[in-house]
Regions:
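Conserved amphipathic alpha-helical interaction elements at protein-protein interfaces in regulatory
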Residues: 91, 104-108, 135
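Conserved G/P- and acidic residue-centered "switch" motifs that form tight phosphate/ATP-binding loops
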Residues: 55, 93, 110
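Active-site acidic-Proline motif in GNAT/NAT acetyltransferases
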Residues: 86-88, 92, 120
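Conserved catalytic-core motifs of GNAT/GCN5-like acyltransferases
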Residues: 8, 115-118, 126, 130-151
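Acetyl-CoA-dependent GNAT
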Residues: 1-81, 86-88, 99-101, 105, ...
């Protein structure tokens, strides 16, 4: 998989974001309504990545900077958003590759911790994050009081 930096509103990113929102509807009954400003995913305060296999967009993910004062966030945090791999490409290691690239770019931009929210209806995502060193943190954002929300973080370090 070739991973490229693209704008959040790039046609390939929009296509994949639409698919991830459909996935949320299937799993949770509604799309993610967390406010997202595309400008937050532009360097140096964020990034959005699309993964391509043979020129076809198959995966995406991004991060946006958080420096407080929102509870749970710390100065230097990067919030991961819209991690997704299309159904037909799952099991090929693309999610792990995308996660690693998001962590590398966040660290290179001076971010010290990656934080994210996922849900109990995405056990494969939870397994990926936990196996990559993510641990539980207090909830934040729109879904912080939802029992099916899972909040995780990982300290970013040079490897």
């Amino acid at each position: 998989m070739e991973i490229r930096v693209v704008p959040f509103d790039h046609p390939d990113a929009v296509k994949l974001i639409d698919l991830v929102q459909q996935e949320y509807v299937t799993r949770y009954g509604d799309p993610d309504v967390t406010p997202v400003d595309p400008a937050q995913f532009s360097p140096p305060h964020g990034i959005f990545l699309v993964g391509y296999r043979d020129g076809v967009p198959v995966a995406c993910g991004g991060w946006r900077a958080h420096d407080g004062p929102v509870p749970t966030f710390r100065p230097g945090d990067a919030e991961l958003k819209r991690m997704f791999v299309v159904d037909t490409e799952r099991g090929n290691g693309f999610a792990r590759a995308m996660l690693a690239q998001l962590e590398r770019t966040a660290l290179a931009a001076g971010r010290r911790r990656a934080v994210l929210e996922t849900g109990t209806e995405q056990p494969e995502a939870i397994a990926l994050y936990r196996s990559s060193g993510y641990t539980d943190i207090p909830g934040f954002g729109v879904y912080k009081d939802e029992p099916e929300s899972v909040y995780l973080a990982k300290e970013l370090k040079e490897s």
